[in-house]
Regions:
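Hydrophobic alpha-helical segments and helix pairs
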Residues: 78-126
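Short amphipathic alpha-helix that is part of the acyltransferase structural core
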Residues: 1-29, 120-152
Length: 256
């Protein structure tokens, strides 16, 4: 396993993967790669495969390119590995084969997610304003509500930028943050990255208030969310608010 020193050094490796029949879960932009290189990006090249390992606090995220007939193997690891395999329905068979290859190396399925999309809606005129919360408070709340390895919590600098840009909408009370919605803006649509309500505040409409804040912030823009399958309250909330499955699904795997 070797560390990537620059995007210029990585680009030829990536170009070699652009062939028919290659299965991948890697959809990063050059800017994304540069951030990963700065934080710690490693790679392993083998017989029909390229693995990219992205450094996180106490674990690594795994991305892969698998050619037909690849003889997949993993470099020695001292940290847990997490990977997510996302695909449309027409690509399910190929991604299932990739999952089987990873599970043969010791990965275990954690859960599945389904992407739901809601068409644009009229922006509310009377949505309340979000309360301000510090980066430290937001980070602590996310770590309380989501698994630190599989919860897609951004690296500190990325999260700090999201807080500064107003992309983390909060409700607060005397006990701190009571509800939080973290979203990623986009030209065609926004995406909800995290939506959580503190345990003692659930069942009182907090999630709906946060969604109204998002609609006001984005002008009612089309919106997508990856929601965990089998979490009934979340599934009911999104269905009630017209978020419909759009054909994309994923499985989250972990090793270690």
């Amino acid at each position: 396993m070797r560390r990537v020193e620059s995007y210029a050094a990585l680009a030829p490796l990536l170009s070699a993967q652009l062939r028919r029949g290659v299965v991948t879960n890697c959809f990063l932009s050059p800017a994304d790669y540069q951030r990963e290189i700065d934080a710690g990006l490693f790679y392993e090249e083998g017989d029909g495969f390229l693995l990219l390992l992205r450094q996180r606090a106490g674990y690594r995220l795994l991305n892969f390119y698998l050619h037909p007939g690849a003889k997949l193997c993993l470099p020695g690891q001292t940290l847990p590995l997490v990977t997510e395999l996302a695909c449309r329905e027409k690509d399910q068979d190929a991604m299932r084969r990739a999952q089987d290859a990873l599970c043969a190396l010791g990965f275990a399925e954690c859960f599945r997610r389904l992407r739901r999309t809601r068409a644009a809606v009229p922006a509310p005129n009377n949505a309340e304003a979000p309360t301000e919360a510090s980066f430290e408070a937001v980070r602590a709340f996310l770590l309380e509500q989501f698994d630190p390895l599989t919860g897609c919590i951004p690296p500190d600098e990325e999260l700090r930028q999201a807080v500064s840009a107003g992309q983390v909408l909060c409700l607060s009370d005397a006990d701190g943050i009571s509800g939080l919605l973290h979203y990623a803006p986009g030209r065609a649509q926004c995406e909800i990255r995290h939506l959580a309500v503190r345990a003692d505040c659930r069942g009182h409409g907090y999630a709906g208030r946060l969604l109204a804040m998002l609609e006001a912030k984005t002008g009612g823009q089309k919106c997508a969310v990856w929601a965990r399958v089998g979490t009934a309250p979340a599934e009911h909330f999104y269905e009630k608010n017209q978020f419909q499955p759009d054909g994309w699904q994923s499985v989250v795997l972990r090793l270690g």
